[in-house]
């Protein structure tokens, strides 16, 4: 019995010893395997880093097997030594800026969101912006045009947004080729403002789209004459910094620094036109696109001063009329108002300014071009003098785009037009026309334009020499003089000097201000669009893409005029429901 017990003890001891030995062996094996894997990764990263630093940075490098997912994770980084395991990695040096994006396999598009190009000083939000150093995106997949965490404070309800909003989004087609040659570099379009939707029609045509946020409203366009306050047109300065960022980094993402276009719609289009008029002489931009911008090319594009409205807003929000500690001092002015408003919540400030119905636009500066004088609103175009041409940049093509009913939505939304008597409508029209043409032209224009008799409810309106007019016709009258006529006049002046200015007016049913941009940004499978609207959207995308790539929106042909006058050179889309046609008029002769 003792012998058996000894044998059992020995067996158990041996088994325990072997178990411990096997456990230790497995532990050391796992440890060695881990160390080996770590050194292998370090070696691989070092080799990749050496390759990246000794050669041109790769635009897109795809690692691993392909997948069928519609979206893949992408890293947009400035540091090639960051070890991140992802399907698609982009190594680019962009002032040490890091951001996350998505890969859209449907159109083979890479989207990069939330790239910081400057910082707003939160202590002094009306002041100069600050440079970006070692910035990393903290918002993940963030669309700067729609996410209130990164977009600029809105001037419309619900007044959301943040002060530190100087970001940009970049969209491009993915490629993995040798981009060392100029032939492969892609043209760039810098689109100003917070646009909702996708610009895949431009990206699919080989254009790199960069959407830029900049300060607008009161934070972007404080106009004053107080020498103590060094704030002036910060919104324009933000745009300048964004352009500088793009030109400095364009080659890193295969962008062509010789083909950079600045574009905008509506109020953003006004900023584009302002930049063209005041700063085109020193910017590396080779084209401009202005969509649906009212009063283009005129002095009305700028405001002289909004100091009084700032002081009023500051007092409403609690600023004392005189300094608390110095009652002998005079009343506070714009300097004190701006200092006080710097510490007011943006939403509260925007609400007060909205109630005061104040619109902030770029402030006038030193005129570098006499284009606004040559064709300014209120002056009849009599031809361009040779001395005026030397101030007009004839080397930079400009594309202007309008719809035939830009003003229609404003008329429809204003109840005063719906219930006004004839004399009220006539006064409104005369007020609009008198700002632009000599009085004797008012009656003449009404006789030519208003030809559609109609009734609004039970009322008949006769604002122009006994002719009746409906709301739609009134919208077209105001559109011609708020949007189309000023643009036509600046085109006439520029083309008279040999410039390449293009103007297109779209006429499609029930369209008004903003519908051209809405169609351009519509999705390919959007169900609420008709077949013709899809054709129209594709046509707009094709023209803009061709203009960005080549400098002209359509193929040039004989007797094709590159501009328009009040009644000539109009491109009409919707001449027939299912066909897109181009109608041009040169010296009174219509060609189809």
UniProtKB/Swiss-Prot annotation:
<feature type="glycosylation site" description="N-linked (GlcNAc...) asparagine; by host">
    <location>
        <position position="95"/>
    </location>
</feature>
<keyword id="KW-0472">Membrane</keyword>
<dbReference type="InterPro" id="IPR029058">
    <property type="entry name" value="AB_hydrolase_fold"/>
</dbReference>
<keyword id="KW-0812">Transmembrane</keyword>
<dbReference type="InterPro" id="IPR002018">
    <property type="entry name" value="CarbesteraseB"/>
</dbReference>
<feature type="glycosylation site" description="N-linked (GlcNAc...) asparagine; by host">
    <location>
        <position position="447"/>
    </location>
</feature>
<feature type="active site" description="Charge relay system">
    <location>
        <position position="513"/>
    </location>
</feature>
<feature type="glycosylation site" description="N-linked (GlcNAc...) asparagine; by host">
    <location>
        <position position="83"/>
    </location>
</feature>
<feature type="glycosylation site" description="N-linked (GlcNAc...) asparagine; by host">
    <location>
        <position position="68"/>
    </location>
</feature>
<keyword id="KW-1133">Transmembrane helix</keyword>
<feature type="glycosylation site" description="N-linked (GlcNAc...) asparagine; by host">
    <location>
        <position position="510"/>
    </location>
</feature>
<keyword id="KW-0378">Hydrolase</keyword>
<feature type="transmembrane region" description="Helical">
    <location>
        <begin position="12"/>
        <end position="32"/>
    </location>
</feature>
<dbReference type="Pfam" id="PF00135">
    <property type="entry name" value="COesterase"/>
</dbReference>
<protein>
    <recommendedName>
        <fullName>Putative esterase</fullName>
        <ecNumber>3.1.1.1</ecNumber>
    </recommendedName>
</protein>
<comment type="similarity">
    <text>Belongs to the type-B carboxylesterase/lipase family.</text>
</comment>
<dbReference type="GO" id="GO:0106435">
    <property type="term" value="F:carboxylesterase activity"/>
</dbReference>
<dbReference type="GO" id="GO:0016020">
    <property type="term" value="C:membrane"/>
</dbReference>
<keyword id="KW-0325">Glycoprotein</keyword>
<feature type="glycosylation site" description="N-linked (GlcNAc...) asparagine; by host">
    <location>
        <position position="528"/>
    </location>
</feature>
<dbReference type="InterPro" id="IPR050309">
    <property type="entry name" value="Type-B_Carboxylest/Lipase"/>
</dbReference>
């Amino acid at each position: 019995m003792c012998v058996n017990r000894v044998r059992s003890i020995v067996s158990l001891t041996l088994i325990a010893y072997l178990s411990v030995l096997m456990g230790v062996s497995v532990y050391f094996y796992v440890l060695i395997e881990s160390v080996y894997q770590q050194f292998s990764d370090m070696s691989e990263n070092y080799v990749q880093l050496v390759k990246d630093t000794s050669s041109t940075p790769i635009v897109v490098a795809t690692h691993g097997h392909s997948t069928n997912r519609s979206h893949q994770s992408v890293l947009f980084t400035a540091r090639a030594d960051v070890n991140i395991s992802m399907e698609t990695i982009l190594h680019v040096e962009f002032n040490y800026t890091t951001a996350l994006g998505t890969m859209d396999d449907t159109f083979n598009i890479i989207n990069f969101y939330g790239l910081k190009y400057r910082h707003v000083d939160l202590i002094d939000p009306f002041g100069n912006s600050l440079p970006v150093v070692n910035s990393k995106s903290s918002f993940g997949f963030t669309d700067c045009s729609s996410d209130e965490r990164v977009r600029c404070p809105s001037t419309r309800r619900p007044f959301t947004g943040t002060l530190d909003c100087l970001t940009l989004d970049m969209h491009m087609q993915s490629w993995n080729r040798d981009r060392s040659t100029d032939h492969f570099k892609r043209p760039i379009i810098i689109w100003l403002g917070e646009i909702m939707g996708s610009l895949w029609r431009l990206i699919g045509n080989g254009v790199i789209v960069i959407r830029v946020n900049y300060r607008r409203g009161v934070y972007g366009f404080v106009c004053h004459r107080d020498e103590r306050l060094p704030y002036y047109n910060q919104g324009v300065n933000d745009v300048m910094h964004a352009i500088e960022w793009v030109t400095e980094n364009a080659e890193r993402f295969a962008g062509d620094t010789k083909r950079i276009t600045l574009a905008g719609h509506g109020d953003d289009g006004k900023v584009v036109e302002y930049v063209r008029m005041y700063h085109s002489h020193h910017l590396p931009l080779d084209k401009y696109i202005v969509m649906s911008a009212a009063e283009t090319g005129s002095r009305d594009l700028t405001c002289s001063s909004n100091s009084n409205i700032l002081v009023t807003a500051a007092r409403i929000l609690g600023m004392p009329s005189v300094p608390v500690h110095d009652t002998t001092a005079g009343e506070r002015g714009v300097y004190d108002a701006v200092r006080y408003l710097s510490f007011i919540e943006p939403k509260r400030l925007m609400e007060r300014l909205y109630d005061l119905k104040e619109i902030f636009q770029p402030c006038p500066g030193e005129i570098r071009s006499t284009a606004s004088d040559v064709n300014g609103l209120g002056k009849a175009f009599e031809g361009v003098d040779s001395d005026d041409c030397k101030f007009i940049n004839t080397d930079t093509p400009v594309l202007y785009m309008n719809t035939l009913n830009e003003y229609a939505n404003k008329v429809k939304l204003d109840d005063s037009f719906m219930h006004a008597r004839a004399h009220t409508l006539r006064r409104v029209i005369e007020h609009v026309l008198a700002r632009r043409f000599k009085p004797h032209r008012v009656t003449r224009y009404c006789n030519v334009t208003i030809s559609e008799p109609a009734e609004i409810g039970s009322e008949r309106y006769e604002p122009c020499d006994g002719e009746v007019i409906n709301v739609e016709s009134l919208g077209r009258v105001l559109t011609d003089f708020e949007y189309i006529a000023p643009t036509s006049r600046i085109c006439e002046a520029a083309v008279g000097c040999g410039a390449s200015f293009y103007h297109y007016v779209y006429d499609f049913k029930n369209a008004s201000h903003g519908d051209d941009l809405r169609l351009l940004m519509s999705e390919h499978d959007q169900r609420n669009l008709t077949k013709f609207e899809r054709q129209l959207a594709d046509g707009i995308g094709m023209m803009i893409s061709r203009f960005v790539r080549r400098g002209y929106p359509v193929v040039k042909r004989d007797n094709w005029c590159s501009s328009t006058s009040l009644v000539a050179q109009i491109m009409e889309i919707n001449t027939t429901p299912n066909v897109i046609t181009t109608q041009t008029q040169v010296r009174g002769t219509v060609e189809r």
